[in-house]
Design a protein with these regions (language model features):
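Catalytic domains of carbohydrate-active enzymes, especially glycoside hydrolases
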Residues: 25-50, 285-286
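Conserved, well-ordered alpha-helix/loop/beta-strand core segments that scaffold catalytic motifs
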Residues: 184, 188-217
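Surface-exposed amphipathic alpha-helices with a cationic face
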Residues: 35, 195-203, 328, 352-353
Length: 500
């Protein structure tokens, strides 16, 4: 990665009149805004179909896209919806919030209406899409249709015949739920069509997309249902152990994620084909891919299934560099960012070095005594060129609120490091942004909320909590020319401007 800069903003957080950010005109406008701000990258969160809890890191599929992101305006232009129908829908009254319960009802109703008016049976592009993607699409669409039939229950609670994918049951549900299966294929077709168009536009403006994928798939996913042999499941397809992380300064009982763990010996036996295919598909969608929880490839935390916390977990060895050598042999060199935050053993550090991928540096961790990593690694003067620097990520407090909540001693450390005792507290975030922009890190990614100087009301996610996460949205009025000019000036000053 060349010396550059970018902004972190989930698609869901874009402005939109339809309850959630999507592939609408506002997304294209944001691309234009980024270009004028001198940026090279737009980093987003995973684009997968979200489930209960609304986390993009717990998706029903590692390959399917979120129908919430389909532009309704584009469907109006196609003639399968009317502007009046879209305007009549109630997506909630707050322009800076996502009301997922209303979204589920209203968008679902409109998308089904669009499907009922579409002529996909005679659409050659739809047929070609289904044929090209049948290797994941057939299982996913059937999974979603059967899930609806079983009133949304996780697949491990379905009837035994379809839970274990007995052929007579598979054939029966494909016939019985044919139109429902086609509906889910239609949604994926529209998602793919609209996303590729938006990405092509971004690339034409010199903006590259940094995508994000979780290392694990969700237990309640088409991936686990269709490929039980690749995961640590018993003969009844029930997990024997699940993923998480041990206790640390942020979470005294650790984090119990609940994802099924990989059966790495099964992946090794196939030459890691599932992972090669997954990453190949990611690079069809993104220019750069950030892999969350990269340390899990060196060693992963295994928690007995049924545990209420992560305290009884233990570390086990992962595939290590062998996996990424197989990926490189199959796909060539690709741009991957290794999320290597938190406590890193020497073997994890060695894996990151051996891979050649840039790791991540988060400014907030440099001054926060709760962090279990080495704080000095996160001080900007120590950032290596082969790294991506952030003020914070989607899991962190906004820079403004973080500075307010750390201790007096930690705030003094920040002031001393900046050698700035005059700037008012409420404006100090700008000095901290400038601090990482002038570091040696090849790329700097700043969350949009930090450029805006927003507090935790704009925080994306607080790990180990549910209810108020993944909801913040940007208001269109916040994308001002003044802010754009300020970002461009700082980006240019520190040699990061995109001149494309």
């Amino acid at each position: 990665m060349q010396r550059s800069a970018g902004i972190l903003l989930p698609i869901s957080s874009l402005p939109s009149p339809y309850g959630i950010g999507c592939f609408s005109q506002e997304a294209y406008d944001f691309v234009d805004w980024l270009k004028e701000a001198g940026q090279t990258y737009c980093q987003i969160l995973p684009l997968g179909v979200t489930s209960y809890g609304d986390s993009p890191y717990q998706s029903f599929s590692a390959f399917a896209g979120n129908p919430y992101f389909i532009s309704l305006d584009a469907l109006v232009e196609e003639g399968v919806l009317t502007a009046a129908e879209c305007k009549k829908a109630n997506f909630g009254r707050k322009a800076d919030d996502i009301d997922y319960s209303r979204l589920y009802t209203e968008r679902g109703r409109l998308l089904r209406l669009a499907y009922s008016r579409s002529d996909i049976g005679h659409n050659e592009a739809f047929t070609a899409f289904c044929e090209k993607n049948k290797w994941w699409l057939d299982d996913f669409a059937l999974f979603m249709a059967v899930k609806d039939r079983f009133e949304g229950k996780p697949w491990i609670e379905w009837a035994e015949d379809i839970r274990l994918r007995w052929q007579p049951a598979m054939d029966y549900y494909r016939r019985e739920l044919y139109f429902e299966v086609e509906y889910h294929k239609y949604l994926q077709f529209k998602f793919d069509e609209q996303w590729r168009k938006l990405k092509a536009y971004a690339n034409s403006k010199g903006i590259q997309i940094i995508g994000d994928i979780p290392i694990y798939v969700a237990l309640d996913s088409a991936d686990a249902w269709a490929n039980p042999g690749l995961f640590q499941l018993d003969k009844d397809n029930i997990p024997t152990a699940v993923a998480g992380v041990p206790p640390d300064g942020f979470s005294p009982t650790g984090q119990l994620w609940g994802n099924p763990l990989y059966r790495w010996e099964a992946h090794r036996a196939t030459g890691y084909q599932w992972w090669i295919t997954r990453l190949w598909y990611c690079f069809e969608l993104y220019d750069v891919v950030r892999i969350d929880h990269f340390r899990g490839f060196d060693e992963y935390f295994s928690i007995p299934y049924g545990s209420e916390t992560a305290v009884d977990g233990h570390w086990e060895k992962g595939p290590g560099i062998e996996l990424f050598r197989a990926v490189e042999q199959a796909l060539g060199k690709r741009e991957i960012i290794a999320e290597d935050l938190g406590y890193m053993s020497e073997t994890v550090r060695q894996l990151v070095r051996d891979s050649g991928f840039p790791g991540m540096k988060v400014l907030e961790f440099a001054f926060d005594s709760r962090d279990t990593g080495s704080a000095s690694d996160y001080l900007p003067h120590n950032y290596p060129v082969n790294s991506v620097a952030y003020t914070g990520t989607h899991d962190n407090e906004t820079l403004v609120s973080w500075y307010q909540t750390i201790s007096d001693a930690e705030r003094a450390m920040v002031r001393d490091y900046l050698y700035d005792y005059a700037t008012p507290d409420e404006q100090l975030y700008k000095s901290m942004i400038a601090l990482i922009l002038r570091s040696a890190a090849a790329t700097c990614i700043i969350p949009m909320q930090d450029w805006l100087g927003l507090d935790n009301a704009a925080r994306i996610n607080k790990p180990s909590t549910v209810g108020q996460n993944w909801r913040w949205r940007l208001k269109k009025t916040q994308l001002t020319k003044k802010l754009q000019k300020e970002i461009c000036q700082l980006t240019t000053r520190y040699g990061r401007k995109n001149w494309a």
